[in-house]
From Swiss-Prot:
GO cellular component term of the entry, any: nucleoplasm
One Pfam family this sequence matches: Myb_DNA-bind_4
Name used for this protein in its record: Trihelix transcription factor ENAP2
Keywords of this entry: Coiled coil, DNA-binding, Ethylene signaling pathway, Nucleus, Transcription, Transcription regulation
Annotated DNA-binding residue span(s): 24-113
Species classification: Eukaryota, Viridiplantae, Streptophyta, Embryophyta, Tracheophyta
Short motif (Nuclear localization signal): ranges: 69-76
Single GO molecular function: DNA binding
Subunit structure: Interacts with the Agrobacterium tumefaciens virulence protein F (VirF) in the nucleus. Binds to EIN2 C-terminal region in the presence of ethylene.
Cellular location(s): Nucleus; Nucleus, Nucleoplasm
Listed GO biological process terms: ethylene-activated signaling pathway; regulation of gene expression
Its job: Probable transcription regulator. Promotes histone acetylation during ethylene signaling in an EIN2-dependent manner, thus regulating positively ethylene-responsive genes.
Length: 248
């Protein structure tokens, strides 16, 4: 009785599916992302031209292509579009992504592109993720990416708890730092203006109280003077009346 030994999944994943000319291995995808990313940065994050895509395809074929399965510029472009869609899906997840190409695409097409003072995005070299047994994690296409993510599981999650921090130059050329500095300066100016306004209000209130006090004192003095004049007038009238009586 013959016994058959089941093939391991890793060995099968290296083989391109029959009839799949658009099949991409993990390593070919890594080379594609690096070649496309460099062109994308040199074009100041603009769209690649046809000649650029041909150069990207040449870079992939020089390392991973054979005569029967060379990648065309159109296949490279379609693959990058697929990777962008995959990135958006990973970006929308609440949990940290364990996808191999997430960090690199986040640097290239994420909401905030990290630039150095010279305006060049610093690229981080790709590293093969290791599973707990130490073997390289490989896959075929984006359909296999989800399977690979499940296989790696918590190991990659732990590995990504301490990712290598990219060096970001926060010099005068950093737009984020300039914006933060401008906001801080605006806050300081606003605080000084508000402080001066409060000081002016206090001074005006003091002046108003001084004027009110002075007016009140003048009014009381006038009333007292008027009262004295009235008393003097009454006194003169009494004296005059008593003098007339004595003369009779």
């Amino acid at each position: 009785m013959e016994t058959t030994t089941p093939q391991s999944k890793s060995s099968v994943s290296h083989r391109p599916p029959l009839g799949r000319e658009d099949w991409w291995s993990e390593e070919a995808t890594a080379t594609l992302v690096e070649a496309w990313g460099n062109r994308y940065v040199k074009l100041n994050h603009g769209n690649l031209r046809q000649n650029d895509w041909k150069d990207v395809a040449d870079a992939v074929n020089s390392r991973h292509g054979d005569n029967s399965r060379k990648k065309t510029d159109l296949q490279c472009k379609n693959r990058v579009d697929t990777l962008k869609k995959k990135y958006k899906t990973e970006k929308a997840k609440l949990s940290p992504s364990t996808w191999r190409f997430y960090n690199r695409l986040d640097v290239l097409i994420g909401p905030v592109v990290k630039k150095s003072a010279g305006g060049v995005v610093k690229s981080a070299p790709f590293k093969n993720h290791l599973n707990p047994t130490g073997s390289n994690s490989t896959g075929s296409s984006l359909e296999d990416d989800d399977e690979d993510d499940d296989e790696v599981g918590d190991w990659e999650f732990v590995a990504r708890k301490h990712p290598r921090v990219e060096e970001v130059d926060l010099s005068e050329g950093s737009t984020c730092r300039e914006l933060a500095t401008a906001i801080l300066k605006f806050g300081e100016v606003y605080e000084r203006i508000e402080g001066k306004k409060q000081q002016m209000m206090i001074e005006l209130e003091k002046q108003r109280m001084e004027v009110t006090k002075e007016v009140e004192l003048k009014r009381m003095n006038m009333l007292m003077e008027m009262q004295l004049e009235i008393e003097k007038s009454k006194h003169r009238k009494r004296a005059s009346a008593s003098g007339k009586k004595n003369s009779h």
